[in-house]
Amino acid sequence: MPAFAIYFLAALAEIAGCFTFWAWLRLGKSGLWLLPGMASLAIFAWLLTMVDTPAAGRAYAAYGGIYIIASLCWLWVAEGARPDRWDMTGAAVALAGSAIILAGPR
């Protein structure tokens, strides 16, 4: 599976898992929300191990840009708040950084 696809799936798993904690602590949802949340966070961590790189730190650094894009998608789709131009500009800069990390000659 291509690194971008793994990173995108990992981002969805992490955001969904973290949102369950947000829902529990900030929105007053049941603590039972944490069960699928913890499973989702475990899937997130497992997915990052699937990236073809010998260095974990590099995998995490490249993942950061993808996470930002996925978070803004979550903001728009799940929370109904449209990202503004500053969100999009920041995401573009972060994505450029991720691309440099992923494409760098090694």
From Swiss-Prot:
Membrane topology: Multi-pass membrane protein
Pfam families to which the protein is assigned, alphabetical: UPF0060 (PF02694)
Predominant location category: membrane
InterPro entries registered for this protein in UniProt: UPF0060
N-terminal signal peptide: none
Segments traversing the membrane: 4-24, 31-51, 61-81
GO cellular component: plasma membrane
Places the protein is found: Cell inner membrane
UniProt key word Repeat: no
The keyword Transmembrane helix appears for this protein: yes
UniProt KW keywords: Cell inner membrane, Cell membrane, Membrane, Transmembrane, Transmembrane helix
NCBIfam families per UniProt: PRK02237.1 (NF002586)
Family under the similarity heading: Belongs to the UPF0060 family.
Protein name: UPF0060 membrane protein Smed_0659
Lineage of the organism: Bacteria, Pseudomonadati, Pseudomonadota, Alphaproteobacteria, Hyphomicrobiales
